[in-house]
Amino acid sequence: MADAPRVLSVNLAVTGGATGIDKRPTSGAVAVRAPGPTGSGLAGDSIGNGALHGGDDQAVYAYAREDLDAWQATLGRALPNGIFGENLTTAGLDVNAARIGEQWVLGTAGLRLEVSRPRIPCRTFEQRLTVRGWMKTFTAAAVPGAYLRVLEAGPVRAGDEIRVVHR
């Protein structure tokens, strides 16, 4: 029997960065709530360009460790959790197969998220990876991860189980 899908790491932007894409794993629980029209859904996180990122429909970004591992092999370099600017690095869940409107419950404290859209890469993402043509390469691979909106606020921490409760 396969392990249950789970959160491998919760990643927050490095304080004082020019953009919010430089995210690093954090320890302990992080509060997640609907941010309104701008900002991140995770307490302590930041968004660099509020015109393109954040807000209720992009409150949380999830990306699978399995996809990071595939990119590691393709690019020939280590890709730590958070490198793609994801708030949640997951394991055991095909994030790319998630459907718009699909709902996930994380952990046991009632955090409920809804898949709102796939990621569309931006120039900052390409600059972060320092791979020429990265936006086109990433888009063509069709492994965008998922943006999520917050339906019910609650904490999230590394190790939390992810349950798909509505598809």
Q: Where are the model-predicted features located?
A:
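A general structural signal for short secondary-structure boundary/capping elements
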Residues: 106, 149-150, 160-161
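Short, ordered beta-strand-loop transition motifs
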Residues: 25, 140-144
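Electropositive, beta-rich accessory/interaction domains or terminal extensions
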Residues: 1-126, 133
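Short beta-strand-turn/beta-hairpin segments enriched in glycine/proline and small hydrophobics
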Residues: 128-140
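A hydrophobic, small-residue-rich beta->alpha segment in the mid-to-C-terminal subdomain
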Residues: 158-167
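Short alpha-helix capping/helix-loop boundary micro-motifs
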Residues: 90-92, 145-152
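Loop/turn positions that initiate beta-strands
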Residues: 101, 153, 157-159
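An acidic- and aromatic-residue-enriched active-site/binding cleft used to recognize and process polar
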Residues: 118, 151-153, 167
